[in-house]
Each structure stands twice: as C-alpha cells, then as structure tokens.
Amino acid sequence: MASVRIQALAAASLALLAAPALAQAPAAPPPLATPNARYIAIVMEQAVDRPAAEVWKTVGKYCDIGAWSPGLKCEIVAGKDGELGAVRRLNGSTLEVLVAKTPLSYTYAQPVRVGQVYNMYHGTLEARPVTAKTSKLVYSLVLDQSMLADDAARKTDAERRRTRFTQALKDMKTLAEGGKLAPPAAK
C-alpha cells in the first residue's frame, strides 16, 4: 500500500515537473505598428551660473515653456500643472502629457493622433547640479524618424530640432541668471 502511494506521488510529481515543458508556447505578440522604427536621441546641454534648485524654480514649471520660448502659448487643459498626467496645449494644438518627474526634471510625451503616424516623441528637461553654485540644463528628445523619406530628411529634422531646443536652453539660461528675453518678433 505504501509503495503504491509512493509510486502515485512520484508519477504526480513527474507530471507536474513535465507540464511546463509540454505546455504550448505563448502566441507571438501582434506586429509592431511601426516595424522598422528609426529611433534617435538628441541630447543638448547648457551651463548655468546658478544652483540647480534655483534654476528649476525659474524654468521648471510645466507651462514655463511659454516664458522661455517667446511667442509660445501654453495652457494646462487637463490635470494640475506639475502633476503626473497633466496635459499642456501649446499654441492651441500640440498636446503634451507629463509622464515622469523628479524634483529637478520632467518628461513629457505627445499622444497618438488619428490619421497620423506616431513618432513616439518624448522630451525631458532637467536642471542638473554641477557645483553648489552652478548647474547645467539638459534637454533630451527621443523620437522615431522612420516616417521621414530618407537619411537627408532625418538629418534635417534632427538639426532643426537641435537648433530650436538649443535656443530654448540659451533663453532658459538667460532667465535663470536673472536676465530678460527680447519680445518675440512680430509676425
């Protein structure tokens, strides 16, 4: 009787151990919406002669973008400024969702729009301490350029973004160091 129980337990144990090997492999995930993505990262830095916390107080609110990008209108259309999930609208059309933050940084993403190829655009603005009295602003962009025609178009797009955001970093430096920006040019 005892040997029958031992044999039954051994058989059950063997079946349990073999079950995962006999289980069906999980189904393959559905294909990617963009199967041949061409992700790029554009990282720009600007030295600032102020402590990081002081810099962040000047340029780090989610809609401060309107102050350091002259002529750009920013409004919070969902959530609360500075809280995860807050949505800002730029110039009445571009939406950006606050998806991550630290005491001296935030990251945003642009949502998917119907009828447009999604480029997975994300941006991060950070005030990074360098010394007790100095810091640097770091602006990082990550996006997919696969919808652009060729390498020349991708290079042009990256250079355009780098130029625009490098100017924004210079303007943030000016404001953080106590300066004022010139009013936007008349259109």
Protein language model features and the residues they cover:
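Hydrophobic ligand-binding cavity/cleft-lining segments
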Residues: 23-80
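Solvent-exposed, polar/charged alpha-helical surfaces in well-ordered, non-transmembrane soluble domains
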Residues: 53-57, 63, 163-170, 174
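Beta-strand/loop substructures that line and gate deep hydrophobic ligand-binding cavities in soluble
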Residues: 113-167
